[in-house]
Amino acid sequence: MTDRPDHIDSRVWELSETQEDWITQVHGHVRRVVECWKYTICCLISNMHTHRGAPQYDVFKWQDRSTIEWICSKKKVQYPERDTPDLYDNERAVAYKVLLVSDLSDHSPTSGIYHDLAFNLEGEAEESCALVLRGSQLQDIKGFLCRALEWVVSNNLTQEVVETISGEAKLQFSVGTTFRTLLKRDTDWDVIPTPRVEPNVPRIEGRRWTQMKKLPLLKEKEGPPSPWRALLLGADSEYIVCPPGTDQEAISWIHSQSEIECIRESKSTPASVITCLTSSLQSFAEGNPVRSRIHEDIIAFGINKKQEKKQSASSSASGEWKRAEYQVEEMSLPPWVEEEMVLLRSDQEDNWIELEKNAIYTEVDGVAEGLVDKYIEIVGRTKVASVIEKWQIAATRTFSQLHTDRSRITACPIITRDPSGNCQFWGMVLLGPHHVKRDTDNAPLLIAEIMGEDTEEKYPKHSVFSLKVEGKQFLLSLKITSFSRNKLYTFSNIRRVLIQPASIYSQVVLSRAAENNSLNLEVNPEIQLYLEGAQRGMTLYQWVRMILCLEFLMAIYNNPQMEGFLANMRRLHMSRHAMMERRQVFLPFGSRPEDKVNECIINNPIVAYLAKGWNSMPNVYY
């Protein structure tokens, strides 16, 4: 029932429509009718009554709150913070609140700041109303409420109206038999239990907690070493220096000067797809970053492959359909992780980090600028800084080209520039035909990168080519892959991995400044760490570089295994800190906090590296 009752004026009903969201409220239609009654009562009280030639009453109900607050402040009317009055008597300078109650004998004033004008459903008024209202006003109100009560009785809405005016309206909720059956269908226990009151006090059963004497070791997986599975290359990334110019001029120079020959072909990336790269290089050199399809693109981007698999599965399927299951192969820690950590923190010639300087307003801003400048000096010329810049440009350009041309091939060159303006060509990402709808949908990619060293065990899915440019030999890797939209967006902000090492560096420097009562930005103290099962020392600068390399590898290898590992390792790290402080750590009986961590060590090489680092540290503290 949503129609207007006959006893309510159409103008009042229309005005009430926008006052509240009646549809979502319990007994929303009845609540709307009751509020219309209160507004009508305000109008009947105010009806043509004057005082000194002006209206005696001001109706505040359903007016804009800011207007009410302005009028009340002007007339010095006090009211509760969230409960504005409904009516104001200019003759008596008194504010009123109009109330409807089910029983006048049980009514008590809601506030001492302004007066209540209370009426019941029969139209009877509280005794105090006779002192402030005229007989004609009371008679009009009684006649209106009698018509309202007649509508309530005829529509059998007495209970709903009483609950609404008493503020006790409750949503009636029940679970139907059909829904109850659906809930219980796949369970062995009642989803909706039957509450029972036991006559006796329930027995409390519990087992003693056990003290953790030593920290548990994590399992190190056995199996083949994990290969490089990140989107782009890491420490093996290299670039070709090109003459200064635009991206088109740099690609044109590369295309005209290069000679390509296959060295190693992988099963997942046939050598024939090199034609896709050369076609895109030629098209880009001619000023067309987007080109039409060629025959080799069908293999490189898996065009129509999904439809072929569906048709093949449908034609050969028999029996009941089941969800596909994919076994996750367990892999061990590869040796290249440690090699990446060493190579990524090696020195380079150029500075790869350029940040816009912030304005200095206070002395703290000046200290912060000095810390940032020193931090950039420490990490700006490392290999990892150059690789971060490469990933940033590649992911940003590829992400920006999603949805621009779904049916053709888009070339996204990875080009940086040195301070002298020379172009540095790292490679190219080819974005294939795609129809990405959700953030988790994958887009097909063909990635070509200049690499420094090829290892088949590390890059089994890469095909490697010899690239000769102006008599110089380079290695060119080619990989067919796909990547989701949300990960491309994440990697377009990969410069954020610089934040955590900067925070660690500033914390050490400022702690030394607090101890010595003076700031020294050149401080480079020795840091004691447990590495490879022994306590070793390294300088602060070396430590910050190592943290940056680890942050970068954790970022590019972030997946559910990494997130679960880090989340569950917090408990073990808290236990270690407590034991180092000579505090006792207790566990529930039979608890094994390392089990949840071990579940996350599967085939992520960086997770395996972190697990090995945990095992190399002491597990007993006395």
Curated annotation (Swiss-Prot):
Protein name per its UniProtKB record: Polymerase acidic protein
GO MF assignments: RNA binding
Family statement: Belongs to the influenza viruses PA family.
Species annotation: Thogoto virus (isolate SiAr 126)
Subcellular location(s) per record: Virion; Host nucleus
Subunit structure and binding partners: RNA polymerase is composed of three subunits: PA, PB1 and PB2.
Coarse class of the protein's main subcellular location: virion
InterPro entries assigned: PA/PA-X, PA/PA-X_sf
Function statement: subunit of the RNA-dependent RNA polymerase which is responsible for replication and transcription of virus RNA segments. The transcription of viral mRNAs occurs by a unique mechanism called cap-snatching. 5' methylated caps of cellular mRNAs are cleaved after 10-13 nucleotides by PA. In turn, these short capped RNAs are used as primers by PB1 for transcription of viral mRNAs. During virus replication, PB1 initiates RNA synthesis and copy vRNA into complementary RNA (cRNA) which in turn serves as a template for the production of more vRNAs.
Listed GO biological process terms: viral RNA genome replication
Entry keywords, A to Z: Host nucleus, Virion
GO cellular component, one term: virion component
